[in-house]
Amino acid sequence: MEDVKWLLKKYGFLIVLMVIIVVIISIILGKRSSEKNVEKVWEPPVEIPFSNENEIRSNNIAEENIEESETESESDTESSLWFLPKAENCLLTKAEKSRLKDTAMVAAEQLKDVYKDIELEEGVSYGSNIREFTKEQRREAVSLLGNAGFVSVTEDTNMENHEEIENFYAAYMENRDAMVTIYEVNRDGLIGAVTFIYRDNRLQTYYVGIGWQGGGIPEIKDTLVSDIAEINLTEKGYFIYAYENPIAHSSLRQYWRVKPLSDKCRELTAKYVYGLSYVNYNVLVTNWDSNNVEDILMPCMFEDIYRIYTGEILSTENWRIPADIYEKIMTTCFPVSIEQLREKCGYDEDSNSYEYEMIFASPYPPFGEVVDYTENPDGTTTLVVDGVWADYNSDCAFTNTIVVQPFDDGTFRYLSNLIEQKELEVPKGGR
């Protein structure tokens, strides 16, 4: 006992410290052992099987995939027409839209021979990407569509079966539901099937764009629904319409000439009127003849006159035009003298050249079309020209009477112009 007391007295503190250490170590080891035991006995919760769960999940995924596929398909179809106005909802049912697309493909099948030898190239998604599509091919396509009973049109060509548009417009004016589809053959060969719908006092268009694969195989490239703000079929025969939301950087209104125009009037328009401006200079907006021809002379007019005379785009050097070229063309095309030209059109004696003044495009300009003509005994021709200003809903804004003198070499001279205001004010012209 004494030995124990002595031991405790001499080493008591050390013994107590060792006991404390042992206890602490035991606690720590016990905690770790407990954690290990918990980890060993823990099992993931048991899943209670539900007999239809996989089936329902599979169906949901399938439905989502279908919806995504339809959305992607519709998005892909319309993506190339992102710049055009779109309606939030369509007046047509899905079945009606499907029938219109089927009919468009039937119409396209009529044209396989026209497109069978086309060459395709890389290009924009909204174009046909046909390397070359001629005016003759466009006219043949319009004729074939017309013979098959479709309303069809292309630039500078009379519309086929135009009576259908007249019937549609008559129904619209009587507040009767109606539809009509126009097949437009564009310059690049793309065909736009535009269906106008009047229903529930609303106007819309449903557009189906038809492109072409090699060998003349048609395909639907685009579809689009757009709200229409107004339509107008003029007495002279222009179908003019406006989108509810106008196309950015485009005309205020779109149009087709519905009633036919004679080939001779189209020929005279192309030769004498096409390319002349009502807004950039005074040739068409001033009453003039040989006595006051100086009133229409200004440098900016030469670019258009050069193109009409030569069929080419004017190119200049240092913004000057050689005097011999300028004076030859202007004295041929107008009853003017060289002296008058040099006084009015920016002639520079040192360089023997004329100033080139660039024409900047004006928004929404009118254009002229020959609607009548008279071949006079003296060899001149009198043209009756209507100013068409579709952007302001007019196909006869003003009327020009232009006298021209054709020459044996194919050139001609403008001799005079008279303009009469009709539905709209005459533009101011150049400065």
Predicted features by range, described:
Residues 27-39:
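Hydrophobic single-pass membrane-insertion segments
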Residues 7-8, 29-30, 55:
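Intrinsically disordered, low-complexity sequence elements enriched in Ser/Thr/Gly/Pro
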Residues 17-25:
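Hydrophobic helical h-region of N-terminal Sec-dependent signal peptides
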Residues 3-18:
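N-terminal Sec-pathway targeting helices
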